[in-house]
Amino acid sequence: MCAILQKAAQESGLKTKFYFEDKGEAARVAGSFVPCGKLLLLADEETADETLALKETFTDFRVYFAVQGKQESANGLFSLPDDVRAAVAVGGRSIAAARFFCTLRGACLVAIPARCSAAEIFCPRSEGGYPVNEPDAVLFDENFARGRAEGAAVAALSALYAEDIDIDGVFSGARKDAGYEMLRLSASLAVQVGAKVGRAPKESGRRRAGSGERLFESLCLQEIALMACPRLPSRAFYHLLSGKGAPLGECAFAALHYAQARYAALFENGRPRRYFVPDYAARARRAAEYVGEEAFANIKVPSAEECFAAAEIFEESRLHFAAAAEALGAYAEKIRRVYYAEGGKKPLFASGALEEAFSLAADLSPMLSVGALERDLGAVHMRGGAYGAKSGAKF
């Protein structure tokens, strides 16, 4: 188990134990929670064959094997006997379904990701909105899990999320919580995906984490951190892009590079217009289409004194944040190399889609972000509800 990740989980009140081993160890891990009895072995359609091959290793259990189809709900699992005491789920859909099943049945769950993703492991609710428990154990096999390009792009968003917290802290005075340090650590691990880490020398008696394991650790730390700070503007930006149906890796990659370019443009070249007043009501109505009446609480219309104070803080902090944006740009360039080296695809969005989503994201969070500062300070001319500035982002 990774000590850093395990400590972060425990400090966040999570019971999950993490194992970085071959998926063939699933029976042993499950047996450490429940020594025998009836067990559900659940697989996605894509992982069915490899999961079925594990069945013979569960010698101390009576195994019920099932496949979770793409359009199937978890309700079909409740036809299983009431005394199923454990479940092993392989793949994202299976993990989500098994979490719902095990929460209601009081069974323990071992989750085996089939992709470099942690979202389905820590999402607090099922698709139907029911609160679900986290898995008792997560077994990550880096030789089995796919999708490193997507995982690296999503993990790299931790750096962007941390910048959101930094900017809001300076302009609003908000304090940073434990999630901030986790995001910084997550970001540092994300760039190690392409590193040649391999195995430790045999004589050392230690096992060195592979780059896939570090990536998964980064993703888990990000998800744990977001439990403490879920309403980040950059996260809203990413979710708006992913809602357009593009692959998650492409959305994350585009969000990182576009937001960094807007960040740099604001603090390097932005000029506040002290008497500019945006149409807050129109923006709130637009945001309410996505989050309901909550949007009207997110957008706080500043007084003239608050606008002048924000403009002063902007000038005082300009050099600091311009340097931070430059550092984020260097980080994004490292992620670019990792992303394409792992087979990532170039993001393709319709004209204006990035500008529109970035503009709207500022109104979906109560935090003072780059987009919110552009809005409140009138630092960038607005056109048709979207910012008209050229991003300078390079994909």
Predicted regions and their residues:
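Short hydrophobic/aromatic-enriched beta-strand-loop microsegments
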Residues: 60-65, 108-114, 248
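Short glycine/serine/threonine-rich phosphate/pyrophosphate-binding segments
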Residues: 49-51, 91-100, 118-121, 234-235
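Active-site segments that bind and position negatively charged phosphate/pyrophosphate groups
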Residues: 176-320
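ATP/NTP phosphate-donor binding region
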Residues: 1-86, 386
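A glycine/threonine-rich phosphate-anchoring loop and its flanking beta-alpha core
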Residues: 100-187, 294
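Short beta-strand/turn micro-motifs composed of small residues
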Residues: 42-45, 89-91, 113, 140
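C-terminal charged capping/lid subdomain of soluble metabolic enzymes
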Residues: 1-4, 8-9, 267-395
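Generic secondary-structure signature for well-ordered alpha-helical cores
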Residues: 10, 140-147, 153-166, 188-206, ...
